[in-house]
Amino acid sequence: MSIFENLSESMLASFDSKDRAREEALRLSREVIRLCSSSIRSMHRGDLEAAERLMKEAALGLEKIRVVLKDHQDVRYAGFVDGAEQEYAEARNVYSITTRHEVLTPEDTGVELVNYLAGLGDTSGELRRHILDLIRSGRPLEGEYFLGVIEEIYCLLMLFDYPDALTRGLRRKSDLARSMLERTRGDLTNALALAKVEASLLRFSDTANAKKS
């Protein structure tokens, strides 16, 4: 057997191993993203038990990815794992912010810093949805806290003005957070103003009825 035959066998074996790891990690990443999306939908429906269960399953999926790619770090940074980590960080923060008014740290979520920040940017969109749900249910005042969180998220993301090669598209997340902030501030301001008008009309009606009686 020539040296080239030996080389080809060993290199092909290496690439076969890497390809199998990539396929498994890709499958797991898609599953993590699906679980996180389902978890967030459960939160908006008020099914917190299901949301927690789905997040735990997603966490297990991320751990499996780390094991599968332990010896293939080049595949780890191909991009698809980042998407899974971002979705997980988003789901964890949406749950924590809406149920406990607590923003989790990167260490709490266990994902890489840049993926944590990207997930936080996406969190602003889910917080906008939560605020709109509060407005529809006649509780606009509760939305002020969450609007403040969106603003803090935007201010945080604006600090990371680094090349895209380092932040992996974080600028787009900053733009998203700014859009969510501006639109939601307008919606909430209108809802609060309407609530004040309705309260004034109710007081006027009560006063008028009291005078009649």
What annotation goes with each model-predicted range?
Residues I40, L132-I135, M158, R185:
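A structural signal for long alpha-helical coiled-coils and helix-turn connectors
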Residues G143-S213:
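Long amphipathic all-alpha helical oligomerization modules
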Residues S17-L28, I40-M43, D47-A50, Q73-G83, ...:
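Non-transmembrane, amphipathic alpha-helical segments
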Residues E52-V111:
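Long, charged all-alpha helical bundle/coiled-coil segments in cytosolic proteins
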Residues I3, L7, L28-E31, L35, ...:
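Amphipathic, well-ordered alpha-helical segments in soluble domains
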Residues R92-G148, E152-Y154:
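Long, charge-patterned amphipathic alpha-helical coiled-coil/hairpin "stalk" segments used as oligomerization
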Residues S29, V81-Y95, T99, L117-G121, ...:
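Extended alpha-helical coiled-coil scaffold domains characteristic of the BAR superfamily
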Residues M1-L69:
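Leu/Val/Ala/Ile-rich N-terminal alpha-helices, chiefly Sec-type signal peptides and the beginnings
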